[in-house]
Amino acid sequence: MAASTNSFLIGNQTQIPSLKPKSISQSFIHFTKPNTINLTTRTKSVSIRCASASTTVGSEQRVINFAAGPAALPENVLLKAQSDLYNWRGSGMSVMEMSHRGKEFLSIIQKAESDLRQLLEIPSEYSVLFLQGGATTQFAALPLNLCKSDDSVDYIVTGSWGDKAFKEAKKYCNPKVIWSGKSEKYTKVPTFDGLEQSSDAKYLHICANETIHGVEFKDYPLVENPDGVLIADMSSNFCSKPVDVSKFGVIYAGAQKNVGPSGVTIVIIRKDLIGNARDITPVMLDYKIHDENSSLYNTPPCFGIYMCGLVFDDLLEQGGLKEVEKKNQRKAELLYNAIDESRGFFRCPVEKSVRSLMNVPFTLEKSELEAEFIKEAAKEKMVQLKGHRSVGGMRASIYNAMPLAGVEKLVAFMKDFQARHA
């Protein structure tokens, strides 16, 4: 990368120089020691020039983070946020200091929505809401907004998150589990032809990708009730591939796995479904309130929305979700092949046709070696590989921000570990 220059104003205290990414579209920026640093005093500018050199995975100070969420963010996005942190675009303030009703933040949230609409090709008949409370809060918001206390709703439970959504809905309506994978330890997705849907169900709810168990819907069921809608929790595969939004009444997702930091929940809802909340619905769970106020009814998670906007911009510059999906398929194929070709040393319990592109759970034939595997991987700067406490084993979350080189390093380590312990 050619040397770049970043100038900003500082106060009496010297500031740590920031690194300006060369392009928001590049996933990893690698750098060497700055060759020019001129620190000055108040009202004078500071000029920082950074030379960079290419390396394999990323800067040597950073680990390869396989966390399920909060998860890794694109390094170039982090560096862009760093360069804007002190003085966003000459505004004289950080995004964290802005009024959420000021013109600066309005431009941020409006661009974030516009870019997300472009990424997912969201029809104009849908509203986009930037909310708080995580996807878990939506487990209650959905029945409160879409049905009455005695209304029927259907749930397909393919993992822990689908199960939690169903249990929360029991407080507010009459939900029914029409299929559960619990008896087979959540390793499958049902065939849709055999589903016995309730004829009067207001909605059919699925979790499109189960983060813990690594099960992903590759297609989506049709709702038999002509007045019902399909609802999907897409927290852990949101913006990982193209989705036909028109098939759904509501799509919701916590941002912290694939498109931003924790603290932001995105809801995409068909407009005709808004405005039917029950009287008991808390104001913060009423979709109409948030829609009428453009997600600004109360103070939103401003910095989190800003970060999501940077991620959306990055995904667009990569060529959109079709290109992103190709990259994700390549990473997942590499890792699953390593597991399947290990002659049973590594094992993935999930049925091959529904294996997640995002979350790859696996175990060792010799379970007593799993702790050693995680320990040795950490020494190689590959972290957060321990499986969820409810299932054990290992789990590699390889979201959009995970570079191919990170998966390649994990696969090389797996093969070396097998050679030493088989």
Curated annotation (Swiss-Prot):
**The organism's place on the tree of life at top rank:** Eukaryota
**Family, similarity comment:** Belongs to the class-V pyridoxal-phosphate-dependent aminotransferase family. SerC subfamily.
Which leading EC class covers this enzyme? transferase
Q: What is its EC number?
A: 2.6.1.52
Q: Where is the transit peptide?
A: 1-50
Pathway terms, separated by semicolons: Amino-acid biosynthesis; L-serine biosynthesis; L-serine from 3-phospho-D-glycerate: step 2/3
Q: Name one GO molecular function term.
A: O-phospho-L-serine:2-oxoglutarate aminotransferase activity
Which Gene3D superfamilies does the annotation name?
Aspartate Aminotransferase, domain 1, Type I PLP-dependent aspartate aminotransferase-like (Major domain)
Which keywords does UniProt give here? Acetylation, Amino-acid biosynthesis, Aminotransferase, Chloroplast, Plastid, Pyridoxal phosphate, Serine biosynthesis, Transferase, Transit peptide
Q: Which residues carry this modification: N6-(pyridoxal phosphate)lysine?
A: K257
Organismal lineage: Eukaryota, Viridiplantae, Streptophyta, Embryophyta, Tracheophyta
Which InterPro entries does the annotation name? Aminotrans_V_dom, Aminotrans_V_PyrdxlP_BS, Pser_aminoTfrase, PyrdxlP-dep_Trfase, PyrdxlP-dep_Trfase_major, PyrdxlP-dep_Trfase_small
Where is L-glutamate annotated to bind? R101
GO cellular component term of the entry, any: chloroplast
Q: Which residues form a coiled coil?
A: none
Positions of pyridoxal 5'-phosphate binding: A135, T136, W161, T211, D233, Q256, N298, T299
The protein's name: Phosphoserine aminotransferase 2, chloroplastic
N-acetylalanine found at:
A51
Function of the protein:
Involved in the plastidial phosphorylated pathway of serine biosynthesis (PPSB). Catalyzes the reversible conversion of 3-phosphohydroxypyruvate to phosphoserine.
Catalytic activity from the UniProt record: O-phospho-L-serine + 2-oxoglutarate = 3-phosphooxypyruvate + L-glutamate; 4-(phosphooxy)-L-threonine + 2-oxoglutarate = (R)-3-hydroxy-2-oxo-4-phosphooxybutanoate + L-glutamate
Which cofactors are required for activity? pyridoxal 5'-phosphate
The protein's location, in the record's own words, is: Plastid, Chloroplast
Where would you find the membrane-spanning parts of this chain? Answer: none
